[in-house]
């Protein structure tokens, strides 16, 4: 189906894609809803237009392109490395603006040279925007979820707390609430006395047996929800989380990390200084970060317009490392955004691990920026 009402610069954008030797790809507007509901993140989930098939399968209008492009790559059993470009409509419930709008972007799948692929994504995003917005100075904000994960792991927090904090990365309101809970733990309440004693005892088998008896007595079927073992382990995890307290020193370390906001050219030194002062070993996460900075310089990207903000993330759950957004300097409107999603294709059914990075353009915002000249 031909695209209509495309912005007038669409042909220039497609020419930029062609110059980068990427393969144009199209995906169906109607998509299976499950992948988006499972891994797209709460911010996107609540904006999805849902429907269902005659057989009751949950479907949705395409809310973004990364997941559909990855699904199409898996379905066609195409080899890697592979670079795809797309341009088409996405559909999201929004308070302001149209609920259907155009996005375009590039997904880079299977390049095992991670620093080079990351640098290429940022270079392509900024390079294309520079052609579409001549004379405008761009501003790029970078974050790195892998560095945050390394900090959280180095502090030795229980795995459950690590997962919670990592899941909240990029959402400062949620992250601050979790940190407040770590400083002043909220103990588990509302449990039956017998269940509470069994959870506290650590006797998993006894707790499972008790839960089985209670479920049988109340006529509750395990097929209708979690099994007794799953419930027991969930209760145990909740108890561990509720009893975990982050000491003042560790809390201040996290606060110090999340406050880092420096030009990218100074970021490697700032992270190394932070790690040394805190006595943390960030290992591979820091070396990968440094490799990306070097790759950006080697690719000729103007580092003077790039900033690193340790607390910066993007509201999509599938990101695993680099995240970035591009604006015109002095403007809050995000014109392009992207990041690395190395686990996404495996989650969607790929038999092999496929490293991946990509970005998308908001064409309506670019059009507005062009009109403001």
UniProtKB/Swiss-Prot annotation:
This function is generally fulfilled by the C-terminal part of HisG, which is missing in some bacteria such as this one. It is found in: Cytoplasm. GO terms for biological process: histidyl-tRNA aminoacylation; L-histidine biosynthetic process. Its main location: cytoplasm. Pathway: Amino-acid biosynthesis; L-histidine biosynthesis; L-histidine from 5-phospho-alpha-D-ribose 1-diphosphate: step 1/9. This is ATP phosphoribosyltransferase regulatory subunit. Required for the first step of histidine biosynthesis. May allow the feedback regulation of ATP phosphoribosyltransferase activity by histidine. Belongs to the class-II aminoacyl-tRNA synthetase family. HisZ subfamily. It comes from the Bacteria. The lineage of its organism: Bacteria, Pseudomonadati, Pseudomonadota, Alphaproteobacteria, Hyphomicrobiales. Keywords: Amino-acid biosynthesis, Cytoplasm, Histidine biosynthesis. One of its GO terms (molecular function) is histidine-tRNA ligase activity. One of its GO terms (cellular component) is cytoplasm. It comes from Rhizobium leguminosarum bv. trifolii (strain WSM2304). Pfam families: tRNA-synt_His.
